[in-house]
């Protein structure tokens, strides 16, 4: 694959994730957009590792580390969202003002 094509794909995914994160009103959708951003970053890590560092797997290993952190973040985020849904009966970001009772 050509380096520019992969970087353009990653930039599109990153841009879609940022747009979705900014415009999202639902917490689950915001978590999905955050995962999309992290996957775009992983594509960059693997691509640059493949093109510029053929013998060492630093980018690939770091990408696996980011995937593990993203899985933990998704699990904790979904647990928080389900807890907020049980209390407030809504997953909308603007209605989750838990600090002012």
UniProtKB/Swiss-Prot annotation:
One of its GO terms (biological process) is ATP synthesis coupled electron transport. This is NAD(P)H-quinone oxidoreductase subunit 4L, chloroplastic. It comes from the Eukaryota. The lineage of its organism: Eukaryota, Viridiplantae, Streptophyta, Embryophyta, Tracheophyta. It is an enzyme of class 7 (translocase). GO terms for molecular function: oxidoreductase activity, acting on NAD(P)H, quinone or similar compound as acceptor; quinone binding. NDH is composed of at least 16 different subunits, 5 of which are encoded in the nucleus. It catalyses: a plastoquinone + NADH + (n+1) H(+)(in) = a plastoquinol + NAD(+) + n H(+)(out); a plastoquinone + NADPH + (n+1) H(+)(in) = a plastoquinol + NADP(+) + n H(+)(out). It is found in: Plastid, Chloroplast thylakoid membrane. Its main location: plastid. The chain crosses the membrane at residues 2-22, 32-52, 61-81. Keywords: Chloroplast, Membrane, NAD, NADP, Plastid, Plastoquinone, Quinone, Thylakoid, Translocase, Transmembrane, Transmembrane helix, Transport. NCBIfam families: PRK05715.1-2, PRK05715.1-4, PRK05715.1-5. Its EC number is 7.1.1.-.
């Amino acid at each position: 694959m050509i380096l520019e094509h992969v970087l353009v794909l990653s930039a599109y995914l990153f841009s879609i994730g940022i747009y979705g994160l900014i415009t999202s009103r639902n917490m689950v959708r915001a978590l999905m957009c955050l995962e999309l951003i992290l996957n775009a970053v992983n594509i960059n890590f693997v691509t640059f590792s493949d093109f510029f560092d053929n013998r060492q797997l630093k980018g690939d290993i770091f990408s696996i580390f980011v995937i593990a952190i993203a899985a933990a973040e998704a699990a904790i985020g979904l647990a928080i969202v389900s807890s907020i849904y049980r209390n407030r009966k809504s997953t909308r970001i603007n209605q989750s003002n838990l600090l002012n009772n």
